[in-house]
Amino acid sequence: MESQRNILLIGLLFVSFLLWQQWQADKAPKPVATESSLVANAANSHSADVPEADTGVPAAVTATSKLITVKTDQLDVQINPIGGDIVFAALVSHKMEQDKDQPFVLLEQTKDFTYIAQSGLIGRDGIDSSAKGRAAFSTAATEYTLAEGQDTLEVPLTYVADNGVTYTKVFVFHRGKFNVDVDYKINNTSAAPLQVQMYGQIKQTIKPSESSMVMPTYRGGAFSTQDVRYEKYKFDDMAKSNLNQATLGGWAAMLQHYFVSAWIPPATDSNTIFSSVSAGGLANIGFRGAVYDIAPGATQEISSQFYVGPKDQKALSAISDTLNLVVDYGFLWWLAVPIHWLLMFYQSFVGNWGLAIILITLTVRGLLFPLTKAQYTSMAKMRNLQPKLTDLKERFGDDRQKMGQAMMELYKKEKVNPMGGCLPIILQMPIFIALYWVLLESFELRHAPFMLWIHDLSVQDPYYILPLLMGVSMFVMQKMQPIAPTMDPMQVKMMQWMPVIFTVFFLWFPAGLVLYWLVGNIVAITQQKIIYAGLAKKGLK
């Protein structure tokens, strides 16, 4: 009876978890979409000197202003010489779709959608501002390619102002990496001092996340400061209030499932993390750096980094000790982090993510085996106590206080913990939820094949075979536990439908998660047989 109730408890906890996370996603108001409110918000922006970006294709990109193309082993990038903005970025080593050769496009600027990385110099003598417009850079070539044996590729852009000051903007690309160094070199050949300030921002058309109850994903902003290690800043947050936080270091990013773009200014600089929403419906998040005073005849260098790529925790940690937090495991991150590490460890040996999931399932079940054994032992003792519990109910009738006291004395005498059957279930749920987030957030599982018909563990089984097998395994587990005569008829009906309900839920779950649950059930059935054989020798049934 207790086992049946425990399975029911798992179902209720699991459904409650899904409903809770869907409520979390839906409870906040949607982004303000009216033109008047967006204009008002833009007018109140703390980043008023930062230039706006037009929606659609920039008018400046004409036959006389050709985009600069940069190709490396990881990135295919296009830079607009007007301002030096990155207006296109494709990830060469990541496909848009598994069965096609088209690379995944993260940044782009089309008629209907804008997602670009903008940077420039603002301030009193800045060459990029709302009032002055953008600088028109010149470059020696319009196509750059990282050659074989070449570790870095520099793309220099030059602008000479009316006062004779030379501004050089250099993009530095690295082999095997998704981060780009953006360096300014200002040679003040004028007779007057200059004052400039670097900024970097990411601009994106407000677009809803492609999220569902079983596959919740986030699309929006995020930032980090010296006081706030990591915080999401949703599009509706930007529409309601402009972010304006002073910090040492920090970073600002746009997130989506598996991928991130981020500006990371120097960790020792005084920066301001800001956000805004422009009148055209573009959400902006970025940083404004320190103000530099450049004396006549002096040269000043100002640098920052831009990352555009997958949520690779190792690569992100190498750039900033908090940037890896964009891989958000939720409130059980402390449990998910070691699970992810163990998953990576197993995969490095077996070379297959599906086998790694099976190994981590065996590990989890092995660690929980002592608790599982204690659970079934407690349940067996409870079953043996049923005749005595029935006698207590008949003896005390409706006197619940005396009956409860007598039951506790009986449990103490027989050394039975009535909650012993629930504890392993309660401990397994956080592990399951943590693994759920690991499989959902880990970009390594994107397009990762297992075997046979499972070509991508990050999406649902295309033929629903794993969910059906999982349902069968639950049915077998259920049949191995006899239904006690004292069990409530309503609970019996709910228990009979639980394998069906779980099967329906798991139809749309990532195949990797269903694989974990299926293997876990098979292991549980095996453990159950072993434990029951041992209990039978002790006279417990």
From Swiss-Prot:
Q: Which family does it belong to?
A: Belongs to the OXA1/ALB3/YidC family. Type 1 subfamily.
What does this chain do? Required for the insertion and/or proper folding and/or complex formation of integral membrane proteins into the membrane. Involved in integration of membrane proteins that insert both dependently and independently of the Sec translocase complex, as well as at least some lipoproteins. Aids folding of multispanning membrane proteins.
Q: How does it assemble?
A: Interacts with the Sec translocase complex via SecD. Specifically interacts with transmembrane segments of nascent integral membrane proteins during membrane integration.
| Species in which this protein is naturally found | Shewanella baltica (strain OS195)
Q: What InterPro entries does this protein map onto? A: Membr_insert_YidC, Membr_insert_YidC_N, YidC/ALB3/OXA1/COX18, YidC/Oxa/ALB_C, YidC_ALB_C, YidC_periplasmic_sf
**Gene Ontology CC:** plasma membrane
Which HAMAP family does the protein's record reference? YidC_type1 (MF_01810)
Biological process, per Gene Ontology:
protein insertion into membrane; protein transport
Q: Which CDD domains match?
A: 5TM_YidC_Alb3 (cd20070), EcYidC-like_peri (cd19961)
Q: Which PANTHER family match?
A: CYTOCHROME C OXIDASE ASSEMBLY PROTEIN COX18, MITOCHONDRIAL, OXA1
The keyword Phosphoprotein is annotated on this UniProt entry: no
- Which UniProt keyword terms apply here? Cell inner membrane, Cell membrane, Chaperone, Membrane, Protein transport, Transmembrane, Transmembrane helix, Transport
Q: What is this protein called?
A: Membrane protein insertase YidC
Organism classification, top ranks? Bacteria, Pseudomonadati, Pseudomonadota, Gammaproteobacteria, Alteromonadales
Regions that span the bilayer: 6-26, 325-345, 349-369, 420-440, 457-477, 500-520
Localization per Swiss-Prot or TrEMBL: Cell inner membrane
> What's the protein's topology in the membrane?
Multi-pass membrane protein
Q: Which GO terms describe its molecular function?
A: membrane insertase activity
